[in-house]
């Protein structure tokens, strides 16, 4: 009986060492073996819609201060970040620009949240931003005026079309100049990104 107990103890100890050796021989991140994560844009939605409206500072208000104010247009982008590596990677920041009608940049998003993506897994990352009629108007007048003129569009007609068309995806929305910053151990990599909302 003592021989069996000693044999089982030695066998269990040997199996434990063997299994621990398998666990600790994982692949370490190197510049050569770090594969770029894959980043498809899953969806874009307008989580709250209050229509299209604008009033100037000359408008008499019932409550509150008069001013140049317009409707809000929140936009929420859902990305699937797929990690093809045999080790976890850290998504340390996201930056991208949102444009309407291909040519008109309306906002640049800079999200500094951190997300761990496990080895061989996919993590969903949501980034939300918001523009107003006023901010979009200023962008159109300052940086998009010549483009508007070339297309024969007016700023107010364009804004109304955007506010009514972006929520139901009848206005082209593009995510461009994207940069996703990944870290694996002490290796840092920026992955470029661009996508058309469908």
What kind of region is each of these model predictions?
Residues 1-22:
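Sec-dependent bacterial lipoprotein signal peptides
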Residues 17-39:
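Bacterial Sec signal peptide processing site at the extreme N-terminus
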Residues 31-55:
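Post-signal peptide N-terminal segment of mature Sec-exported envelope proteins
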Residues 48-74, 82-89, 116-118:
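Short, solvent-exposed beta-strand/turn "edge" segments of beta-rich domains on protein surfaces
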Residues 71-77, 170, 174:
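Short, solvent-exposed loop/turn segments enriched in Ser/Thr/Gly
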Residues 82, 86-105:
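Short acidic, flexible loop segments centered on an aromatic residue
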Residues 101-147:
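Intrinsically disordered, low-complexity Pro/Gly/Ser/Thr-rich segments with frequent PxxP/GP/PP motifs
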Residues 133-198:
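Terminal connector regions
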């Amino acid at each position: 009986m003592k021989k069996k107990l000693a044999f089982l103890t030695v066998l269990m100890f040997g199996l434990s060492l063997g299994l621990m050796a398998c666990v600790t021989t994982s692949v370490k991140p190197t510049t050569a073996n770090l594969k770029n994560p894959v980043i498809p844009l899953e969806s874009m939605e307008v989580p709250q819609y209050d229509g299209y409206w604008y009033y100037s500072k000359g408008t008499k208000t019932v409550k509150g201060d008069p001013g140049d104010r317009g409707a809000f247009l929140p936009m929420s982008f859902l990305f699937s970040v797929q990690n093809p590596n045999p080790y976890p990677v850290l998504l340390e920041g996201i930056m991208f620009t949102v444009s309407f009608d291909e040519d008109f940049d309306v906002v640049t998003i800079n999200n500094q949240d951190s997300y761990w993506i496990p080895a061989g897994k996919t993590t969903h990352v949501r980034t939300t931003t918001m523009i107003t009629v006023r901010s979009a108007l200023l962008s159109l007048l300052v940086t998009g005026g010549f483009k508007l003129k070339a297309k024969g569009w007016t700023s107010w007609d364009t804004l109304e079309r955007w506010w009514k068309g972006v929520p139901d995806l009848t206005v082209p929305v593009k995510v461009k100049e994207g940069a996703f910053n990944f870290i694996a151990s002490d290796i840092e990599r920026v992955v470029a990104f661009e996508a058309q909302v469908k």
